[in-house]
Regions:
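FIC/Doc superfamily catalytic core
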Residues: 1-149
Length: 149
């Protein structure tokens, strides 16, 4: 059984990251686009024509990260929140990230385009996602190849 993140879980992650890293948090929720959060939480477990929108746990983790970052759910801290939400989802569901994260080739393109070593890979993946340079499909492939379940 999959443990999904709730709206409250994600708001709490945003609040924790804002307090830990000096970001802005406007109580009670810090929303910029509440409807985007409602949709992403619902979509994580949804089906289309009887098939899951995000069939694997790695697809779901990618969805959380990509949707929070690209849809600017919060007034501040979307990159940190998206990253931490994905990491939390993986951990909650018994998955793990590989000790040494790597860039992956997707349709002849390196994702992320820069970075060596785990810290750099996280940084560039997150920044490129925020800049619109990484698609959801590329994010899904990256998570598939960098997680174990």
């Amino acid at each position: 059984m999959i443990d999904f993140l709730t709206e409250n879980d994600i708001v709490h992650i945003n609040e924790r990251t804002a307090r830990a890293h000096g970001g802005k948090f406007e109580p009670p929720t810090n929303y910029l686009h509440e409807e985007a959060l409602v949709y992403l939480v619902e979509a994580a477990g949804s089906e289309v024509f009887g098939a899951p929108m995000y069939p694997s746990p790695s697809d779901k983790a990618a969805h959380y990260m990509f949707s929070i970052i690209s849809n600017h759910v919060f007034q501040d801290g979307n990159k940190r929140t998206g990253l931490q939400a994905a990491r939390t989802f993986v951990q909650l569901n018994g998955g793990a990230f590989h000790k040494k994260l790597k860039a992956v080739e997707v349709d002849g393109r390196r994702v992320p385009s820069e970075g060596k070593g785990t810290k750099d890979i996280w940084f560039y993946l997150t920044m490129e996602m925020a800049a619109g340079a990484v698609s959801l499909e590329e994010t899904r492939e990256w998570f598939k190849r960098n997680t174990s379940w």
